[in-house]
Structure formats: C-alpha cells, structure tokens
C-alpha cells in the first residue's frame, strides 16, 4: 500500500487497531514505567483504593447499622463511580501528552482520548472482578445473583465514562481553568452518583430528581444484578442507553469541532 491509496474497511480497522495498541503501550510505559510491577499498577491502583474503603467499612462494623452486607454495598457502588470519575480526569491531559504524535496521519485527537479512557476502564474492570472474586472466596460477600445483568450495567457505565471523558476534555481544551477544577467538581458529584445510597431510601421528591442522573441508573442496575430481588431498585435501562448515546454524540461533535484547531508540536 502506497501513501494516498484508499483503504478498505477491513484495512482501516486493522490500522486503527494498531494505532490504539501503540498508544496504549506508550501510555502504560509513560505512566507506570518498565520497572517493578509496571503494567500491573493499571489495576493495582484502583484495587488498593477499593480495598481501603472496604476495610474501613469492615472495621467500623457497618453490619450493626443494616442487615444488608455493607461490604457488598460498597463494592457495587464505589468502584463504578471511581471508574467514570478517573476516566474523565485522565481524559483532560490526553491531548497535551500526545501532541507530538499528531504529526502521524493515522493518529487523531479522538484516539488519544479513547486510549486514556480505555486504560482507566480496563484497570477498574480488572480490579472489580479480582476483588469481588476474592471477597466471595473468603466468604465476606455472597456470589452475585445475576452476573450478566451486572456486566450489562458495567458496559453501559463504561460508555458513560467514555462520553463524559470526551465532553470534559473538549471543555477543558477551550477553558484551561475548567481542567484544573474538574477534579474537585467530579469529587463533589460522587455523592449524587448513587454509590452511597439506594434511590428507594430517598424521599419521593428526591427520587424524581435523582433519577435524572444517568450514573444513578447504572449503579442501581449493577446492584440489582448483585442483590437480586432482595433490594428495591429504580433503574431504567432505556434511559441509561439513550443518555449514553446522547452524551456520546455530543462529545464526538465537541471533539470534532476543537480538533481542527489542535496543532502538533
């Protein structure tokens, strides 16, 4: 294939795959290095944070305040919230860290954002699977009621993380100050992510407000998959899917618009 030749769809997919793979390897080496455990920090980092939260709940004997397994409650809410929060935070610096690579015609701004979000989602996913498996094996939590339903919820929230990452990156690219304060703003959003409460326990008026937030539907859905009918949840898969697609479309349009003004350095 010569420069300027048109490629088939299959060839374009292969090229895109190589670009993403190369960006992933570069990101991993840049962030974690080649020494010590290197790549394994990808999921050790979120795993350790989740471990700290779980142990805190374990030693304050949260079971005294509820008949619900509070460790399972934390595991089905906090890691998912941290996934989209960390993904959006990491997306902000994706372009500045890869400006020199944009000289390559096959590397686009969108690729750099997607790579960072993918890395965060992968790390959070591996940590979640490993830690939940360990907790089930040592009998601290029960086995999930419906794993498939949980996987669908996790996938939809991974889509949300990607869409949010695109939007936040686009805004931060236009307004530098936003990129600096988003870390704090995203932390403030954690309490309304559904990670620390069930919608069912809120007053009726608060429930109607809470259900306008897509991440609450993802958390409720994930917990429904884990606890089954032992808890009352209010998720709407349709609302979450539509929200994800709308945010994704908005994010892609915003990235496309500002990408035209990004110059390689």
Swiss-Prot record:
It is a multi-pass membrane protein. May form an ATP-driven capsule polysaccharide export apparatus, in association with the BexA, BexC and BexD proteins. The lineage of its organism: Bacteria, Pseudomonadati, Pseudomonadota, Gammaproteobacteria, Pasteurellales. Residues 37-258 form the ABC transmembrane type-2 domain. GO terms for biological process: lipopolysaccharide transport; polysaccharide transport. GO terms for molecular function: ABC-type transporter activity. This is Capsule polysaccharide export inner-membrane protein BexB. The keyword Transmembrane helix applies. Disulfide bonds: none annotated. InterPro entries: ABC2_TM (IPR013525), ABC2_TM_bact-type (IPR047817), ABC_2_transport (IPR000412). Belongs to the ABC-2 integral membrane protein family. It comes from Haemophilus influenzae. Keywords: Capsule biogenesis/degradation, Cell inner membrane, Cell membrane, Membrane, Polysaccharide transport, Sugar transport, Transmembrane, Transmembrane helix, Transport. It holds the Pfam family ABC2_membrane.
């Amino acid at each position: 294939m010569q420069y300027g030749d048109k490629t088939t769809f299959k060839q374009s997919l292969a090229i895109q795959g190589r670009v993403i793979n190369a960006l992933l390897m570069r990101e991993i080496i840049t962030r974690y290095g080649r020494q010590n455990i290197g790549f394994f920090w990808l999921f050790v980092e979120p795993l350790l944070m989740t471990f700290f939260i779980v142990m805190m709940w374990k030693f304050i004997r949260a079971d005294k305040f509820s008949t619900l397994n509070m460790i399972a409650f934390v595991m089905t809410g906090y890691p998912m919230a941290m996934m989209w929060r960390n993904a959006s935070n990491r997306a902000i610096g994706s372009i500045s860290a890869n400006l020199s690579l944009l000289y390559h015609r096959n590397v686009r701004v969108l690729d750099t954002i997607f790579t960072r979000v993918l890395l965060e989602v992968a790390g959070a996913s591996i940590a979640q699977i490993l830690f939940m498996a360990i907790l089930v094996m040592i009998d601290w939590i029960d086995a999930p009621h419906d794993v498939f339903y949980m996987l669908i919820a996790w996938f939809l929230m991974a889509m949300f993380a990607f869409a949010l990452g695109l939007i936040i990156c686009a805004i931060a690219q236009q307004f530098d100050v936003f990129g600096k304060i988003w870390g704090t703003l995203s932390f403030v959003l954690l309490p309304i992510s559904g990670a620390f409460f069930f919608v069912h326990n809120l007053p009726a008026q608060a429930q109607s407000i809470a259900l306008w937030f897509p991440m609450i539907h993802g958390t409720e859905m994930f917990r429904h998959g884990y606890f089954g009918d032992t808890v009352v949840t209010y998720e709407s898969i349709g609302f979450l899917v539509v929200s994800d697609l709308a945010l994704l479309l908005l994010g892609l349009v915003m990235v496309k618009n500002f990408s035209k003004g990004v110059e390689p350095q």
